[in-house]
Amino acid sequence: MGGKQSTAGRPRGAFPGVSTDDSAVPPSAHFGHYRPGGTMGLRSRSVSSVAGMGIDHSATVPFGFYTPRGTDSDRAGGGSGSDPAHNGNGYQETGGGHHTDGMLYLGSRASLADTLPLHIAPRWFSAHSGFKCPVCSKSVASNEMEVHFIMCLSKPRLSYNDDVLSRDAGECVICLEELQQGDTIARLPCLCIYHKSCIDSWFEINRSCPEHPSD
């Protein structure tokens, strides 16, 4: 009975189908769906393409712009913020939003208008048929948005005089009901008249006359 030969010193071959070439090893997990040799730039990512990137899956994955996160060596050699376009954490600063593990998150479509700074917002609205002012409800071209905001917010609210209607005066354009004798009305500087309760409600969302919004 001969002794069983030892296999301790025998070189172990590669497993079938497994490459030992280091170049075939994929990048670390935090690179997600990015190609290591390419430049992403600013681009929209679908819901499926941002899975596994640190987003809370219990919430709706938002629309946003994403940039690839740099490697550990890039972050180590990035300095302490000497380059104003970079923060040393692997993504390029473009303004607005907040950053979440290798991407620039600017919020959902519904809230994008509220989160974008003014130097980025015109790009968004120019691609979406202008901008509707929340103060006066007028449609404004994106390149006039900042000026319009300043004028609209600094414009004083219209005043009016209370009065009691002495005779029927047609239709109130706010509630579309008749202005009848004895109704309490509001007379604006432009001489338009409305039910007092109607114009009070109107002024909560708009500072201009319903029939003369440009005044």
Swiss-Prot record:
It is a peripheral membrane protein. The lineage of its organism: Eukaryota, Metazoa, Chordata, Craniata, Vertebrata. It is found in: Endosome; Lysosome; Membrane. The gene is znrf1. One of its GO terms (biological process) is protein K48-linked ubiquitination. This is E3 ubiquitin-protein ligase znrf1. It catalyses: S-ubiquitinyl-[E2 ubiquitin-conjugating enzyme]-L-cysteine + [acceptor protein]-L-lysine = [E2 ubiquitin-conjugating enzyme]-L-cysteine + N(6)-ubiquitinyl-[acceptor protein]-L-lysine. The keyword Zinc applies. A lipid is attached at residue 2 (N-myristoyl glycine). E3 ubiquitin-protein ligase that plays a role in neuron cells differentiation. Plays a role in the establishment and maintenance of neuronal transmission and plasticity. Keywords: Endosome, Lipoprotein, Lysosome, Membrane, Metal-binding, Myristate, Transferase, Ubl conjugation pathway, Zinc, Zinc-finger. InterPro entries: Znf_RING, Znf_RING/FYVE/PHD, ZNRF_ubiq-protein_ligase. Residues 1-39, 66-96 are annotated as: Disordered. The RING-type zinc finger domain is required for E3 ligase activity. One of its GO terms (molecular function) is ubiquitin-protein transferase activity. It comes from Danio rerio (Zebrafish). Its EC number is 2.3.2.27.
